[in-house]
């Protein structure tokens, strides 16, 4: 009888795994081993149109995942992003990879994927590559704090203009889609216009956690309440909530896009106008006052995960000694602040950002 029950339980677990898209199609982001990718595409044409009017181009993607044989897929690629695409600083823009139907990716590491953001190298220099690695590690740090975060997968990517081109090979990474983040966390994705949701409607623990993360990495390039006019809210954040929650309550912000952070310290990143900082490596807390009540427990979470987060940085062999030492120092200064309750009060609790709903009362 016990054996029958065990078999039934195992069968039920197997059925659940294959019935759940979030579990059945997580191969790409369930492994940390870097992919080997080669993209062959008309990159001269792509670069010519990238700044003004990005259009999709046909491409071939060859990918190797660990010891598995190389697989080749027909895809489309398109320049994406804003600063790195149009700002005149990067020689090469980030890309969007668009796959075909489900059958075209079945049996590959991209099973279940339709579109993916690929973060590329910006400029073909080692220091730029190190900063792309730091962006990748910023995502990994937030994964340590909460599973309600974007997962990323590292890749060594070769970009070729044609089959006879040796190409340029640099570190890059792909980013999980927000719908997959929601499914994986048994949540639903929320979409709304700028200023349609206020800080009072957030899951306050999640909002404090996200706000402290942005402070940790020294990022001021974000807003959880407002975004560009006519675009999905908000600025460098997307949102989910529990599937059974009331509309636009218990909202969980999920930050992304960290190239303007002090943690990365991109050469083109400048401090926002109007804020009392001289450069991006100077931290300023911009989390919302509505979340202050959760901050003591969130600070405790971060302190408890210090060793694990530092290991993410120190155990990555791709980061060179110069950048590792600089990054360790930057992180150590954050944890030194958390160890001092008076500094937490004066540099995090007190300077919090007043939300839209509270702006008339302060």
Write out the residue ranges for each language-model feature:
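Bacterial N-terminal signal peptides
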Residues: 8-18
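Positively charged n-region of N-terminal signal peptides that target proteins for export
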Residues: 1-6
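Phosphate/dinucleotide-binding and metal-coordinating scaffold of catalytic cores
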Residues: 23-362
């Amino acid at each position: 009888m016990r054996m029958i029950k065990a078999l039934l339980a195992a069968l039920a677990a197997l059925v659940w795994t294959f019935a759940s898209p979030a579990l059945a199609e997580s191969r790409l982001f369930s492994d940390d081993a870097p992919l080997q990718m080669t993209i062959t595409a008309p990159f001269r044409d792509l670069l010519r149109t990238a700044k003004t009017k990005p259009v999709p181009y046909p491409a071939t993607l060859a990918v190797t995942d660990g010891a598995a044989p190389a697989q080749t897929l027909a895809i489309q690629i398109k320049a994406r992003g804003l600063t790195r695409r149009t700002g005149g600083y990067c020689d090469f823009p980030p890309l969007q990879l668009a796959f075909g139907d489900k059958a075209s990716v079945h049996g590959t590491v991209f099973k279940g994927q339709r579109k993916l953001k690929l973060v590329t190298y910006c400029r073909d220099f080692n220091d730029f590559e190190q900063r792309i690695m730091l962006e990748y590690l910023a995502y990994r740090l937030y994964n340590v704090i909460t599973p309600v975060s974007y997962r990323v997968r590292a890749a060594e990517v070769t970009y070729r203009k044609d089959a006879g081109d040796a190409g340029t090979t640099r570190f890059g990474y792909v980013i999980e889609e927000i719908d997959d983040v929601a499914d994986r966390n048994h949540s639903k994705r929320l979409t709304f216009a700028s200023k349609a949701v206020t800080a009072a409607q957030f899951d306050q623990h999640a909002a404090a956690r996200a706000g402290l993360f942005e402070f940790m990495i020294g990022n001021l390039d974000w807003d959880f309440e407002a975004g560009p006019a006519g675009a999905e809210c908000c600025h460098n954040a997307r949102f989910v909530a529990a599937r059974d929650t009331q509309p636009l309550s218990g909202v969980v912000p999920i930050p992304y896009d960290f190239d303007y952070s002090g943690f990365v310290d991109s050469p083109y990143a400048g401090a926002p106008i109007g804020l009392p900082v001289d450069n991006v490596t100077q931290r300023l807390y911009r989390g919302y006052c509505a979340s202050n009540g959760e901050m003591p427990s969130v600070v405790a979470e971060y302190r408890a995960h210090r060793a694990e987060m530092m290991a993410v940085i120190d155990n990555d062999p791709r980061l060179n000694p110069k950048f590792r030492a600089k990054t360790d120092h930057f992180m150590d200064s954050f944890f030194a602040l958390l160890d001092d309750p008076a500094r937490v009060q004066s540099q995090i609790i007190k300077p919090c950002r007043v939300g839209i709903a509270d702006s008339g009362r302060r």
